[in-house]
Amino acid sequence: MEKIVVKGGTPLIGEVQVSGAKNAALPILAAGLLATEGTSKFYNVPKLSDIKTIGLLFESLGVKVDYKPEENTLEMDARKPLLTEASFEFVSKMRASFLVLGPMLAREGSAKVAMPGGCSIGSRPIDQHLKGFEALGATIIQDAGFVEARAEKELEGTTIFFDFPSVGGTQNVIMASCLAKGKTTIVNAAQEPEIEDMINFLIKMGAKIEGKGTSVLVIEGVEKLVGTEYTVMPDRVEAATYMIAAAATKGDVLVKGAPYKDNVALVSKMREMGVNIEVVDETSMRVSNKLDSLRPVDVKTLPHPGFLTDMQSIMCVLTLLADGTSTITETVFENRFMHVEELRRMNAKIRIEGRSSLIEGLPHLEGTTVRATDLRSGAALVIAGLMATGITKVIDIYHIDRGYVDIEEKMRKLGADIQRIDE
């Protein structure tokens, strides 16, 4: 069984290049299914197991895929008619696989997809996806762990109001609307940078979309979309991970691929704690911290432009350096404090009250064996290991591999005493 072994006590110093964003790459690749003419080639595609999984899913639908992880490229040819059933084998492994439903429905008028999988961080309902498809004219059938969408005639544009700004729902409905007849307006759409990135790709393919970066999107359906080339945005959660690791180890790291505009909430909270952050240019920030203790902080996760839920477990580790009690409130998912029990094993003083975790700062963290319960908790535990006395072993690191490219190698180049072992 593979594990990551960390010896704490070394400040991270140097520079690190952030990889392409998984949460942007996956929906962008799904959007590539809409291209009935030409082929698409994607750059800055991260070398991750989830990318391999979605590539295999595409191949099962009849798409030609050439994924070169070492070159960070993926080419796809989706010109042939798509098969209309997405296998449980792939969709159960990764929630983002559900994003094939919109393109399949738009192109073929029918789609059957297994209920999505992914990290066990609470209920992540698909009702907003289905509400949007029904509004466009599809009939939805849910049975035996599958969702089937059928359109007896061409999808027709309409106004869709989301009850909450669902990221996946926004992405799926945008893709379905691109080939629908007439105009579709999505009200209370999610505004995440990864959605903007997908919209930029769709526009380059020939889609007509207005309102990018706002909560109201207007999509004018077109007859066809054409394959093109596109470079995926950098991963803002990976950027946050190295920014927080630099501060937590009292280091000094230049993080390349960390645009300030995509990380405003994180930067604001880190500066509030006393961390020094310099915006070097449009895509880079330098993070340093020489303080023995930071100021406590209150954080509440919210849809963009609020504090990203994917960053809260990592932020929790940084608050362990605060002189006082910090509070992190999770409003997006109801089961995202699984990292807390593992941090307690390292001597962290954290208690849960409802949807909030209260973190008492300045414990003496001690290395031990801990389990990555999900993708982001795994990264949080690696950072905690960098802060702790002694040796920390993180097991179940397959979660980490779903979202981080060469995490131990990148940290080792910054001076961390970290290695991956198989025993």
Task: Locate each region found by the language model.
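Short, structured segments at the rim of ligand-binding sites
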Residues: 1-423
